[in-house]
């Protein structure tokens, strides 16, 4: 988590430097008297290329996510969650290493950095990591604890998001942008190969209820769960088994989505949440730099504010509201999470709209605070989704949720980056176009969330 949150501002700065150098190798520098271009790297062609590269970089994970999430999820059922988690971390580390190699040695165009997605086929990338972590929580926690643990995971993410920019900002101010990126790479390496040693394997801890045993018959057989040191299948048998189990898993999943309208509704609402929350990280620094002339290094302050507000809300304010209001009124976990999710999505929509139309930097900061309030919607919706299906279907719908989220985020990235380019071309008043567009999408999600059932039902296949 910390490795990811150290990168955003430093990567934008390095990308801009590389694009700027490449551009002026074939184009003359602007006249020194041109006050509008005191920094030659702020020329529109350079900023346009930067926005497009950053946007298409979000498209990179879509193919590994689509092709690998289910197979690696099934592989985790056979060889263990922990081993797949290590593989996924190794793939993410390798992808970042490729980007840094392209930018440092410059042996190819900056667009070659987009090939980092090929390394994500090792382990499946962030989608598999997120899915495995959620399944590990489901292995060990009951319904009452699940939502709280998901919020704690989100809190860990936002806390690292606070310290990441707080660390990178001062280093970038002193010109140590590459030190920040090397620190990020070292952190990812530690997370992939060192910290995972201390994470227990949860495959054998799964409660062996009738519903759980129906998830994947092979994954709960004595050969794979009761005897952790049993002989592993050969690669050929494992490959054939994964293909067969993928087919067996997708068929019930499609059946669930066709018959369980609540699960389908929750999946559709969940899909744009991560993209909305990460929009400022994706294009916010470039947007703020263009609109309010705030440097990327100092833009880390906004990222720290954003992440710190998320942590404060998730760790302190939301639990306090739960104790003072929800618990005293006797709300069920489902009713509580439903209301929180609706309010969170509405707050995100409001915050994005404020950022998009902000006339001053302080107003943009207030918009970020509203988005921070809405940032817990992902954990809340995942909890609702887990409660809307049978226990035997949780792993499948979680995989579907993360795949859908990655796909939507990957598609939204280039689209909103293109809107940022359009806004830059149209002028100051239109620069917030991508934020306003995303705000309208979240308004639709907020309206849709009002159709979530007010109470959990026993018959999961009811419409």
PLM features: residue spans?
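Glycine-rich segments within core transmembrane alpha-helices of 12-TM secondary carriers
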Residues: 145-173, 187-188, 310-313, 402-415
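Intracellular juxtamembrane helix-capping segments at the cytosolic ends
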Residues: 10-11, 124-142, 284, 376-390
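Juxtamembrane intracellular "pre-TM" segments in multi-pass secondary transporters
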Residues: 202, 206-275, 290-291
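A late C-terminal transmembrane helix in Major Facilitator Superfamily
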Residues: 391-425
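A membrane-interface helix-boundary motif in multi-pass transporters
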Residues: 173-188, 333-339, 415-442
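Cytoplasmic helix-loop-helix junction between adjacent transmembrane helices
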Residues: 116-159
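Multi-pass alpha-helical transporter architecture, strongest
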Residues: 189-203, 355, 411, 421, ...
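C-terminal ends and interior cores of transmembrane alpha-helices
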Residues: 85-109, 342-359, 364
């Amino acid at each position: 988590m910390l490795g990811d949150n150290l990168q955003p501002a430093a990567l934008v700065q390095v990308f801009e430097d590389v694009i700027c150098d490449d551009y002026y190798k074939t184009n003359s520098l602007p006249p020194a008297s041109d006050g509008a271009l005191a920094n030659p790297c702020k020329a529109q062609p350079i900023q346009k290329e930067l926005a497009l590269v950053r946007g298409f970089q979000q498209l990179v994970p879509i193919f590994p996510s689509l092709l690998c999430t289910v197979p690696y999820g099934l592989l985790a059922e056979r060889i263990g969650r922990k081993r797949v988690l290590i593989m996924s971390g190794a793939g993410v580390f390798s992808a970042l290493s490729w980007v840094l190699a392209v930018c440092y040695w410059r042996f190819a165009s900056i667009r070659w950095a987009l090939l980092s997605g090929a390394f994500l086929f090792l382990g499946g990338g962030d989608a598999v990591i997120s899915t495995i972590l959620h399944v590990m929580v489901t292995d060990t926690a009951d319904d009452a604890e699940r939502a709280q643990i998901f919020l704690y995971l989100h809190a860990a993410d936002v806390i690292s998001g606070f310290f990441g920019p707080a660390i990178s900002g001062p280093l970038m101010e002193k010109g140590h942008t590459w030190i920040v990126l090397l620190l990020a790479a070292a952190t990812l390496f530690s997370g992939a190969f060192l910290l995972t040693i201390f994470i227990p394997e949860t495959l054998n801890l799964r409660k062996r209820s009738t519903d759980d045993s129906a998830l994947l018959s092979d994954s709960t057989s004595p050969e794979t769960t009761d005897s952790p040191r049993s002989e592993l299948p050969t690669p050929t048998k494992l490959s054939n088994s994964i293909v067969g189990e993928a087919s067996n898993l997708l068929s019930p999943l499609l059946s669930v989505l066709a018959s369980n309208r609540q699960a389908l509704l929750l999946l559709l609402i969940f899909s744009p949440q991560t993209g909305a929350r990460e929009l400022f990280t994706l294009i916010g620094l470039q947007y703020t730099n263009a609109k309010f002339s705030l440097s990327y290094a100092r833009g880390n302050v906004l990222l720290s504010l954003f992440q710190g507000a998320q942590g404060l809300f998730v760790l302190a304010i939301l639990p306090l509201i739960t104790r003072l209001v929800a618990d005293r009124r006797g709300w069920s976990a489902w009713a509580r999470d439903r209301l929180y999710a609706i309010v969170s999505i509405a707050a995100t929509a409001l915050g994005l709209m404020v950022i998009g139309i902000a006339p001053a930097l302080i107003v943009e900061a207030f918009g970020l605070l509203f988005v921070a309030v809405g940032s817990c919607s992902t954990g809340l919706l995942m909890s609702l989704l887990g409660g809307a299906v049978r226990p035997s279907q949780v792993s499948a719908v979680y995989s579907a949720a993360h795949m859908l989220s990655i796909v939507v985020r990957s598609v939204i990235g280039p689209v909103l980056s293109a809107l940022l380019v359009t806004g830059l071309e149209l002028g100051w008043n239109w620069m917030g176009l991508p934020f306003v567009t995303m705000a309208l999408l979240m308004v639709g999600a907020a309206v849709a969330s009002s159709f979530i059932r007010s109470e959990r039902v026993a018959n999961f296949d009811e419409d």
